[in-house]
Amino acid sequence: MKLNTIQRKKFRVTGKLKKVASSDRLRLSISRSAKNISAQIIDDVKNITLVSCSSVEKDIRSMDKVNKTEISKIVAEKLAKKAQEKKISKIFFDRGIYKYHGRVKVFAETLRKNGMEF
């Protein structure tokens, strides 16, 4: 089966990160749509999701007059807080098929400000 451009790009980025995965350095996978953004910290050795956060959660969704970039910051802050509660600080940033620009860049910078290392 022939892969399209998006699938090739995803396999190229995520595949490299899965090869170097270890239990001390986890993978942060991010996904975004036109309205929402979500992220999860994954342990590729055990194949489990340790922490996740999304803009569709009730407390974030209920905010009025907040643009998508601000929502991205809020989700990143909440994810960093959840990760610190589970004593996770070192991660690989898996941007997937998305360019490191806009909401993805703001998300990554906010994570760095809140103590995550990648």
From Swiss-Prot:
Gene3D superfamilies: 3.30.420.100. Pfam families: Ribosomal_L18p. One of its GO terms (biological process) is translation. InterPro entries: Ribosomal_uL18_bac-type, Ribosomal_uL18_bac/euk. SUPFAM superfamilies: Translational machinery components. One of its GO terms (molecular function) is 5S rRNA binding. GO terms for cellular component: cytoplasm; ribonucleoprotein complex; ribosome. Keywords: Ribonucleoprotein, Ribosomal protein, RNA-binding, rRNA-binding. This is one of the proteins that bind and probably mediate the attachment of the 5S RNA into the large ribosomal subunit, where it forms part of the central protuberance. Belongs to the universal ribosomal protein uL18 family. HAMAP family: Ribosomal_uL18_B (MF_01337_B). Part of the 50S ribosomal subunit; part of the 5S rRNA/L5/L18/L25 subcomplex. Contacts the 5S and 23S rRNAs. This is Large ribosomal subunit protein uL18. The gene is rplR.
